[in-house]
Amino acid sequence: MTVLEIDLLDETKNLLDEDKQLVENILQFAAEYLKIEQGTELSLTFTTNEGIREINREYRDKDQATDVISFALEEMGDGETEIDWGEFDLETPRMLGDIIISTEKAEEQAKDYGHTKARELGFLAVHGLLHLLGYDHMEPDEEKIMFGLQKEVLDAYGLER
């Protein structure tokens, strides 16, 4: 069963089809595992270190490459008013937001951690999804919850280190 509608873009043009399929499969599994409603949408972009560095600089004021960045559409910004969508009879699907992964950083980290690139891509995809769902790891208690759930999902899927 397909829970998520994933708009996937490979800006690198270097990612293997099986890596893309693995990431999509893990995200679908995670969506079912986390009981995300059917038809929920997200975008997933694979980019280079330079591509993610530009995004990181523009949106986070950090002039460096990172492994994954998530932009949650349901997250409230400063001064924004929350809209109760429940009062509208809309047939539009829920859009979680965007996950951007640097494939170069994923390769670097896979080597550093001694596991496969596929495992690292799966880890980063689930990490990004959890951010879209509102999880964070800025505080120790938040980190424990998020990383615990991340491990639980990856273990349930069977993605080995």
Curated annotation (Swiss-Prot):
Organism phylogeny: Bacteria, Bacillati, Bacillota, Bacilli, Bacillales
InterPro entries attached to this UniProt entry: MetalPrtase_cat_dom_sf_prd (IPR023091), YbeY (IPR002036), YbeY_CS (IPR020549)
GO biological process, one term: rRNA processing
Disulphide-bonded residues: none
Cofactor, free-text remark: Binds 1 zinc ion.
Any single GO CC term annotated in Swiss-Prot or TrEMBL for this entry: cytoplasm
HAMAP family: Endoribonucl_YbeY
Main location: cytoplasm
UniProt keywords, alphabetically: Cytoplasm, Endonuclease, Hydrolase, Metal-binding, Nuclease, Ribosome biogenesis, rRNA processing, Zinc
Positions with a binding annotation for Zn(2+): 127, 131, 137
NCBIfam families: rRNA maturation RNase YbeY
Species this protein is from: Listeria monocytogenes serotype 4b (strain CLIP80459)
Subcellular location: Cytoplasm
Protein known as: Endoribonuclease YbeY
Cofactor(s) listed: Zn(2+)
SUPFAM superfamilies membership: Metalloproteases ('zincins'), catalytic domain
Record bears the keyword Ubl conjugation: no
Leading EC class: hydrolase
Coiled coil residues, start to end: none
Matching Pfam families: YbeY (PF02130)
EC id: 3.1.-.-
Cited function: Single strand-specific metallo-endoribonuclease involved in late-stage 70S ribosome quality control and in maturation of the 3' terminus of the 16S rRNA.
Molecular function in Gene Ontology: metalloendopeptidase activity; RNA endonuclease activity; zinc ion binding
Gene: ybeY
Family the entry assigns: Belongs to the endoribonuclease YbeY family.
Source superkingdom: Bacteria
